Amino acid sequence: GISLSGLASAVANEGGVGVISSAGLGLLYRNLSKDYIQASIMGLKEERCKAREKTKGVIGVNVMVAMSNFADMVKTAIAEKADIIFSGAGLPLNLPSFLQKDSVTKLVPIVSSARAARVITEKWHNLYNYLPDAFVVEGPKAGGHLGFKDEQINDEHFSLEHILPEVIDEVKDIETHYGKNIPVIVAGGIYTGEDIKRFMDMGAAGVQ
């Protein structure tokens, strides 16, 4: 696994947000438990602890909605006081339900459309009186489970350059309606400093 404590702490030490992937930890930590679910929980605790020993920076956890142990990983990340949970590969509609009164973890959905941002916001507010702390917007060139079709990958109508302004406009409406600042972070197919500047100039608050 690449997206574990080593990379996360290195990124955090450089001023970025270090992210630990929760996917497949039960396989990496089979020595701790023969039960995959339990090994995954113990593995996430171990990786979070290792990261914290190496940095005082921001450490987040990525938890995919599509994972069978989604709830266990979210609960563990919150209990371990992860700074942020990033969640995509589906709409994380029930993510705020796992927060406790003393929870410090911020919740950041990963979306690929303005509509997804609106649906998540309305659901979270109506059911949990909670609003996203930020959004990550991924285009078809991002690695992961995005739901884009093959023919859409190189279609400019589905490009990040096309999607980002739509999401930013949607989030501006959300900010105005609810009175909360919600940063929009852009991700997928961004390689160079020029790429970063281009998307920041378009209104992105950050780049992944």
Map each language-model feature to its residues:
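A general structural signal for well-ordered alpha-helical packing
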Residues: 164, 193-196
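Structural beta-strand/beta-sheet cores of well-ordered domains, especially the beta-sheet scaffolds
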Residues: 133, 180-182, 205
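Structured core elements
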Residues: 136, 185-186, 208
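Glycine-rich beta-strand-to-loop/alpha-helix junction loops that act as flexible
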Residues: 183-191
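A compact, surface-exposed functional segment
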Residues: 197-208
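Short, catalytically relevant binding-site loops at active-site mouths
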Residues: 142, 190-193
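Active-site entrance/lid segments in N-terminal catalytic domains of soluble metabolic enzymes
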Residues: 1-178
